[in-house]
Amino acid sequence: MYHKVLVPLDGSTLAECALTHVKTMVQEGFAREVTLLSVVHVDAPYSELYGAHFDINKMKKAYFDAAGKYLAGVQARLGTEGIQAKSEVVEHDPPAPAITDYAAKNGLDLIVIATHGYTGLKKLMLGSVALSILHHSRTPVLLIRPEASRS
């Protein structure tokens, strides 16, 4: 049913908790294709606002290169377990709409994303990419708590 799975990653250990479940899904035949997605946001620093020269294109390239290198490392780790994944880096702010749009435009069946599981004031203060994806995605979403990846 969920053959094409999207895993948004931001470079954090928390985000990678989703990989444990995706690996199981692939190994048990529930998923065939895995796409790793990193969303970067490149914004001019405050110095640019005050007339200091800043090469935004150089900064953008550095962000894309770092995200691409990170995803290549994740792909390599998955590859050692026999799981092939493709990866892509996109630019957008905030990240949630980029993730939901990417899933819809590329015909993906499931978004698997880790979440802190914050509630109440913590959720309001910190925001939640996972919650925004859950509320706005037309693609089914599987939320993974870090504790679940350890079991």
Task: Please give the residue ranges for each predicted region.
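Gly/Ser-rich helix-loop-strand patches that form or flank binding pockets
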Residues: 104-151
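Small/aliphatic-rich secondary-structure junction motif
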Residues: 1-54, 77-79, 83
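Structural beta-alpha unit
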Residues: 24, 76-111, 151
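Acidic, proline/glycine-rich short linear motifs
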Residues: 39-69, 150-151
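Short, structured motif recognition centered on aromatic/hydrophobic residues
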Residues: 7, 34-36, 70, 113-114, ...
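Active-site loop/turn elements of alpha/beta-hydrolase fold enzymes
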Residues: 39, 92, 146
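Short, well-ordered secondary-structure micro-motifs
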Residues: 18, 46-49, 97-100, 123-125
